[in-house]
Amino acid sequence: MRLVILDNYDLASEWAAKYICNRIIQFRPGQDRYFTLGLPTGSTPLGCYKKLIEYHKNGDLSFKYVKTFNMDEYVGLPRNHPESYHSYMWNNFFKHIDIDPNNAHILDGNATDLQAECDAFEKKIKEAGGIDLFVGGIGPDGHIAFNEPGSSLVSRTRLKTLAMDTILANAKYFDGDLSKVPTMALTVGVGTVMDAREVMILITGAHKAFALYKAIEEGVNHMWTVSAFQQHPRTIFVCDEDATLELRVKTVKYFKGLMHVHNKLVDPLYSMKEGN
């Protein structure tokens, strides 16, 4: 497990974007060899997406041979609703890059048979060869995707009832009106994300500091689903200084002492431009 600590949100976002960029380019994707990327929504990854868009517009990165699988989607919210994750991904990322829309997979929260939709999503991931890099974020209660506290740590893509903490947190996106906030969602399982060859989890802000503490300094616990990734062979937690406030001083000191190693993963930043 790696813990990468940057001074602030912008630097953490940039480090994460550089890492994704380098992993895609090192993979050398092509017509018969797609890089498969798992993606989150929410406020945390926005800075990372902006940097990836910048790399694309500069000609350094192409998503032509990338397939994406999103973590989750609300149930019952129209696809074109401004707060649907289809809208989020299109407006904040997909419409700014060269990905084929057929290669951008998002769960359909309006499917007639929701369980069949979940099963089909798992099948699509398998047919794509599995996820090369799954990027995630967490909530203050340590949930990843919509795997709320108490979720099975071997769970697969399924229908979930949202915890009240999550509904309250999401109310800001629905004019503060709890009655408008979806109470159910389709989500990949903890096991689905654990199956990825590599996982990178973005954690920023003091309000997520206790969750980061639970994620890496205490044992694996289904009440803090993000803690499951202690047992993944290739997990990177990328955080800002504020998110480390609940960690032991020696933990922070240890991982900061490794930053010269971690920075070699993103420096130099590779490019798809000819000659780079």
Swiss-Prot record:
Its EC number is 3.5.99.6. The keyword Cell membrane does not apply. It comes from Bos taurus (Bovine). Pathway: Nucleotide-sugar biosynthesis; UDP-N-acetyl-alpha-D-glucosamine biosynthesis; alpha-D-glucosamine 6-phosphate from D-fructose 6-phosphate: step 1/1. Homohexamer. It is found in: Cytoplasm. This is Glucosamine-6-phosphate deaminase 2. The keyword Isomerase applies. NCBIfam families: nagB (TIGR00502). InterPro entries: Glc/Gal-6P_isomerase (IPR006148), Glucosamine6P_isomerase (IPR004547), Glucosamine6P_isomerase_CS (IPR018321), NagB/RpiA_transferase-like (IPR037171). The lineage of its organism: Eukaryota, Metazoa, Chordata, Craniata, Vertebrata. Disulfide bonds: none annotated.
